[in-house]
Amino acid sequence: MLLVTGVTYASLKTRTKAVDNFFKGACVNIGIVEKNKNKEMILEDSGTGKDGAYNESMENNSNVYERISENMRTTAKEVAVKNITSQDYPTTDTVVRVRFVPVLVYDDNEQNKKDNIAGQTVPLDMRGKVDYILADGVVAEASSQETEAKWIYKDSLSGDINDRYYYYISALEPGEVSEMLLKEVTYNGELPENTHFELRVLAEGIAKAQLPYLV
């Protein structure tokens, strides 16, 4: 059995790198779409060639946000998912889910480079330290009776909101962009010196045609 899937991610301060799949006839290629400060829709990573392969030498759009600090704990983070298709790399209807992964990262400065920790993740438990302001009217708990919801979620057994998966209720057609999922993120934990907060948005996709084979 062959499952055609794709994964992509985006974070507050880094560019997205899509993981693409090269199976003709049922390709999956998804990307994170975000609103910038001018409320323009930006595909977080445009660095793919005509064949859909990621190419670091190509120009990339990296959406940079206001940095969370002791004095500013909330920042805008408006995200959606796009089914990226092209004539040379046609995709199929894709079912997607998203998870938020908050982390603290050591700054890329001289001191951290000297200590050989620049860019590394700070080992810190993020449970109870992050709040997400979800898009108005389109996100609902799976068991609710909300009929207008485009995204649904079910809390995990751990009770940690960072373990949630958000599922788009309809498959994205080639070229289609989902409704916005997230508006803002707030971090209420500690910020050690020479570190910064990042929210990594992980998106996974599977070809709609493969769903009947999942048990």
Predicted feature locations:
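Long, small/polar-residue-biased beta-strand-and-loop interaction regions
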Residues: 1-215
